[in-house]
Each structure stands twice: as C-alpha cells, then as structure tokens.
Regions:
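Loop-to-helix "switch" segment enriched in basic
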Residues: 8
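Intrinsically disordered, low-complexity linkers and terminal tails enriched in Pro/Gly
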Residues: 16-17, 131, 200-202
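Short helix/strand-capping turn motifs
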Residues: 86-161, 165
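Sequence contexts marking disulfide-bonded cysteines in secreted/extracellular proteins
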Residues: 34-36, 50-52, 149-151, 173, ...
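C-terminal partner/receptor-binding element of secreted or periplasmic proteins
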Residues: 156-202
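Charge-rich, low-complexity N-terminal segments
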Residues: 2-5, 15-87
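Sequence termini and other peripheral, non-core segments
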Residues: 11-12
Length: 202
C-alpha cells in the first residue's frame, strides 16, 4: 500500500518538496560606511568598498557617475557583475543580501544572491527641485561560483507584491546553469517606472 501511495505521489510531483527544502536562505547586511574603502582615481570614480558577506565570500561595491556595481566572493576585477548596473542613476551603499544556499551536497554551496537596489526613475528626475531622491526599487539576482559572477535577472520590487518569491524563482531555476555573457538576463513580473538593463541583442 505504501509503495502504491508513494508511486501515486511521485506521479503527481508531490515528492519534489524535499528538493526545494535543500535550498535555504541566509541573510547578511552591509553598510559602506563601515567597510574598507579604496578611493577612486578620477572625479567620477567614487572608489570601491570591501564589505563582509557570507563565510569567506565578500561583498564588493564600486561606484562612479552616480551608478553602482556589486560583486560577491573573492575579489576579481574581471567579474562581469563589475560592469553591470541599471541605465538610471542608482545606489546600494547599504542593504541586506539574501544568499541562496544549496544544501544537497556534503558542503552547503551558495549559488546566488538577491539584493535590493535603489533606482532613480524618470519621474524622480523630472520632479526633482533639489538633490534627486530615488523611489524605484529592484531586486537583482546574481549568480556565484566558478562559472563567473554576473546578473541573472531582475524584479521590479514596487510593481510586484511577490517580488521576493519571483527573485528566488529566478535564482533557484536559473543561476546554477546560467552562462555569464552568453545567456539573456531575465526580467520577471511586472515592470513599473524602473528602467531595466537590456542585453545587446534585445
């Protein structure tokens, strides 16, 4: 009887839950004011910040021309993530990193991060009477690992009430097989005022 029940559940896909349970989230925070700062060499180069992350994986921030770049892990200048940002002015000087961890093996392996960015929208820019304040918010999913560190996808955090779930879905279903510089980045859910990055052939 148990075998028959198990077979029926397997046919219905109800035994796939343990696979999902083998992925968990770990959260860390950073604040550029408390991180090691290296000054930039030019006026529009604001420098870089090395911040603590998860275990031996660091959070590296870089900023210039009112835009930011973020990568994770051992610092590498050639990480594709260090050239990926949003078209509009943006910042992420502090925040909470959600690390997606694969626990199916002997050692837990972080394979993606999710981080909320602040982005200036066209309305922010047009209606500003002083320093521009950003009201746009987007979740950025970044892949980790030997295949490179790069953006996998984006979710407009204000246009989608389930933004966190959408971002986790991008991470869990795509990050581990995503080919940096080859695969198209994913935009999931509705898009409001935030201008999303575009791949060259789109």
């Amino acid at each position: 009887m148990l075998a028959r029940i198990g077979g029926a559940l397997l046919a219905l896909g109800l035994l796939s839950a343990p696979a999902a349970a083998q992925i968990e989230s770990v959260y860390t925070t950073f604040d550029a004011k408390k991180c090691k700062h290296q000054k930039g060499r030019e006026v529009e180069d604001y420098g870089s910040w090395l911040c603590p992350g998860y275990q031996n994986l660091r959070v590296l921030l870089s900023a210039g021309d009112q835009r930011m770049y973020v990568t994770f892990g051992p610092w590498k200048k050639d990480a594709l993530a260090m050239s990926q940002t949003f078209p509009g002015f943006n910042d992420v000087y502090q925040g909470t990193v959600e690390w997606r961890i694969d626990k199916s093996g002997a050692q837990p392996k972080p394979f993606a991060t999710i981080l909320r960015w602040n982005i200036v929208t066209p309305n922010d820019r047009d209606n500003a009477t002083g320093p521009i304040k950003s009201t746009g918010r987007a979740l950025v999913v970044t892949r980790l690992g030997p295949g490179g560190v790069c953006h996998v996808g984006y979710v407009d955090a204000k246009a989608n009430p389930d933004a966190n779930e959408l971002a986790r879905k991008i991470a869990d279903e795509n990050a581990r097989t995503f080919k940096c510089g080859k695969d198209k980045r994913i935009v999931s859910g509705k898009v409001g005022e935030v201008g999303m990055p575009q791949d060259e052939d789109e």
